Amino acid sequence: MFVVAFFGLSLVAWHPGVTAQEKVNQRVTRAVTPQAVSCQLSDWYKWTDCFPCQDKKYRYRSLLQPSKFGGTICSGDIWDEASCDSPTPCLRQAQCGQDFQCRETGRCLKRHLVCNGDNDCLDGSDESDCEDVRVTEDDCHQYEPIPGSERAALGYNILTQEEAQSVYDAKYYGGQCETVYNGDWRKLRYDPTCERLYYGEDEKYFRKPYNFLKYHFEALADTSISSEFYDDANDLFFHIKNGKSHSAGVTVGVAPVKSPVSIEVTGSGSKASSFLNKLNKYNEKRYGFMRVSTKIQTAQFKMRRNNIVLDEGMLQSLMELPEQFNYGMYAKFINDYGTHYITSGTMGGIYEYVMVLDKEKMKTEGTTVDEVQKCIGGGIGIGIKDSTIEGVGISGEFCENSGDGDRDIRKKITGVEDIISRVQGGSSVWGSVLTHNSSAITYQSWGRSLKYNPVVIDFEMQPIYQLLRHTNLGPLETKRQNLRRALDQYLMEFNACRCGPCFNNGEPILDGTNCRCQCSMGRQGLACERTVIEGLKDFKAAGHWSCWSSWSECRGGSQERRRQCNNPPPKNGGTPCLGRNLQTQAC
């Protein structure tokens, strides 16, 4: 039996009879199930050369065809690695001339950065053998780095929606002593041990790393809640997908880092897969979903655009890439450091939860969606900012702001089957507590911890190959073009456009090497091709994009590629595909 991993729907076989379930099955509209397609992997490509700085070699195989419609799935990974002994020494950056060279990675440093008290080399070799360490006049070493700096320095995989390894060096200061003022230091704090009030003078200033052009603490935080109600799991899935869509025409997804795959619906952040998996058991049509989220901003930042200093690990990997194109080696680089890098964004935290509602119990007890909505803010003591539920008012005494959290909501609302939370940012202690109990006290404590433990909650980004134009390493055009070529192939290989067609508003999912269709309410089948509820024959169905074609030949300094809204096309006046069907690029 075919099972869907996220929000899976059980398939019901058709049998004549007189039971209640069989009467439902008798209403199934006959439709032709698409032919099963089995997964195909290529043979292993040859091993890469031994990476001398890692003493490892790698090989890969391509996903020629994901399995579809119940076809045989593939087993095993697409990546493989083995230990090796390199005949050549560990590669270093080009000779540094009169400048200092870090022993381990070969990074070049200006002489004034040696023995200045900052570890500008990962191995600390620039600060070893120093008889007299020069300390800056302002003694910047007493300041902590700006909160969240190491998170903003990470690469980002647009397919997996996961952070990758560090791209920027978040600990490099370039001999500069630039600080950021924190206005919150004036707030009085209480020390229970010494029983005294004090100002947090040690948090008055934070030090800004070289790769950060701007960083500004936010004085105001957005602490309002937004809520949306979804009638079934597929409806929730669809809106999560649209909320995270990107203009580049790439299908985003959730997947293990070792085996990048695409899933066309996802939440953001590294915990998205777990968040969706917890909802998997609530896939029956009797369940509805109230999705509630709040976002708190703590800082705005912008990264340096030119003369970027790369993380030493990335620098080392970049120097090992061959000048001649090798997809396996370049794809491994993308897999490690991400498809994109962050250029600017917002720090803070996100608290999101989904209330799983048993609609049958609510109907029996006379509980309405309006009443549920009125109770949402009461559990954690804050108000509703916006709601997509038409005609719902915020006033009323159905659920007061008691601040008792999940217990308050479960007690006052009949039909709340479960509350599934996801927390991003803040201290690990309060974040863990908030996940299991969303009371006013835990919410406020978590919010206060965000200032010094934020994550990147909104950001702008660029493809990873563009970074090579803006480093301090000199010309890298050949490797940049190779990386761009590899990224196009990488994004296409693991895109959910290779799945489908999923009919009747079904959502295509590429999980590992297996394609699946998440069906909307009243639809069944491996391709959601069957109708199990009367009156849905003229149901409006949205269209889905095909994959992009290959790039055309270069003409007049540009080339183009196209895609079609036929996977499947819109039906009965359904929504056409969003986005452009044509892309151009310089060549």
From Swiss-Prot:
Q: Which UniProt keywords apply?
A: Calcium, Complement alternate pathway, Complement pathway, Cytolysis, Disulfide bond, EGF-like domain, Glycoprotein, Immunity, Innate immunity, Membrane, Membrane attack complex, Metal-binding, Repeat, Secreted, Signal, Target cell membrane, Target membrane, Transmembrane, Transmembrane beta strand
Residue ranges constituting the MACPF domain according to the UniProt record: 136-498
Q: Which residues form the propeptide?
A: 21-30
All copies of the EGF-like domain together span 499-529
Cite a single GO MF annotation: protein-containing complex binding
Q: Which residues are glycosylated?
A: W44, N437, W545, W548, W551
Q: Membrane-spanning regions, if any?
A: 248-256, 259-266, 377-384
Subcellular localization, per the record? Secreted; Target cell membrane
Q: Which residues form the TSP type-1 domain?
A: 38-91, 542-586
- What is the protein name given in its UniProt record? Complement component C8 alpha chain
